[in-house]
Structures are given as C-alpha cells and as structure tokens.
C-alpha cells in the first residue's frame, strides 16, 4: 500500500474507532481520575459531573469488604440529542443519608448528570446526591425501574443504558446492615420532544 494513502486513511480509521466505546456507544468513556480508572478511592468522598449538555448513561462499581465495606465508582456520559436542546438549569438534589434505604428522582423534571458522595466510617456507608439538569420544559413519561445492580450484595456493578430514548431520572436503593452494601434500581424515563405544563412528574 502506498505510504501516502496510509497516512490519509489512518486518521479516518482512528476517528471511527474512537467514537464508539466498549459497548457500541458514542459516549465519553468511563472517567479516569486514578491509575485504576475510578473516580474515588475507598473511604473517600467524590464529586462527578458530566460535561455540559451530557447525562449519565453508565455506572460501574466494585466492592471491597476489607476497605471499609466501601465501593469504588466510575461513570460514563453521553450528549443528549439535539431534540432536547441545551440544559436550562442544573442543581444538586437533597442529600440521601448514609445507612438508610432511599428513593429519589430529580426534581423539576431533571435528568441525572452527576453524583456526589461522602463516606461515613461510623456507618460503613455513603450519603449520596444527584446532580440534575433540566431541559427546557420537557416532561418524563414511560418510566420504569431497572433490575437490581449489583444482582447480589458485594458483587461488581455494571449498569449501562443501551436505549438512546431513555434517561436516568433517579434511583431507589436498599441497604444491608449485615453486608454494609447497597443494591440500586435506576429510574429510567423517556422525555417529551415538546414543552409540557407539568412542573414536576
């Protein structure tokens, strides 16, 4: 093959390959703050936000009993479609306390675009906050809960939203006082392509 042709084709192949992640998604790969690819070390707090105009589409986590029964976390983001437009406002939701089960959706019809968490040694658990963004006056519909992630306490967690039409709006979690771990069910919703009158759904 002519060397000049190779130099012309190489950037095209690299660009086509690079736009898809491990799961065939054109989303930003899992964020890498450390050598091991996690946004936090065990027993440490963290704050993660998607870039402007992107939302969370994947959540990955591993559990360590010996490191305070804590988890390390990683996230992936994806740009929202043009039909949603740009986010009109973003905010941090109320804190979900450590050691308790909880259920929360983004208020004001928001979508999850980040997570913030702090670890408490006394409870061997974390408190959580969602970072939410609202897109004009779009409303959620056809919402459903995912299965539990992880499938059993202490297991690795790998949740990926394979459907472009559904967005994470929140989660419900259970907490095991014995295992000191959580199982998550994510609240997935579609969003209208037009403005609606409901202040919060």
UniProtKB/Swiss-Prot annotation:
Keywords: Cell adhesion, Disulfide bond, Extracellular matrix, Pyrrolidone carboxylic acid, Repeat, Secreted, Signal, Sulfation. It comes from the Eukaryota. The modification Pyrrolidone carboxylic acid is found at residue 19. GO terms for cellular component: collagen-containing extracellular matrix; extracellular space. GO terms for biological process: cell adhesion; collagen fibril organization; negative regulation of cell population proliferation. Residues 26-186 are annotated as: 2 X 53-55 AA tandem repeats. Sequence repeats lie at residues 26-79, 70-75, 80-135, 125-130, 181-186. Residues 70-186 are annotated as: 3 X 6 AA repeats of D-R-[EQ]-W-[NQK]-[FY]. Sulfated on tyrosine residue(s). Disulfide bonds join 50-77, 90-132, 106-133, 139-196, 143-189. GO terms for molecular function: extracellular matrix structural constituent. The keyword ATP-binding does not apply. Residues 1-18 form the signal peptide. It is found in: Secreted, Extracellular space, Extracellular matrix. Interacts with TGFB1, DCN and collagen. Seems to mediate adhesion by cell surface integrin binding. May serve as a communication link between the dermal fibroblast cell surface and its extracellular matrix environment. Enhances TGFB1 activity. Inhibits cell proliferation. Accelerates collagen fibril formation, and stabilizes collagen fibrils against low-temperature dissociation. This is Dermatopontin. The gene is DPT.
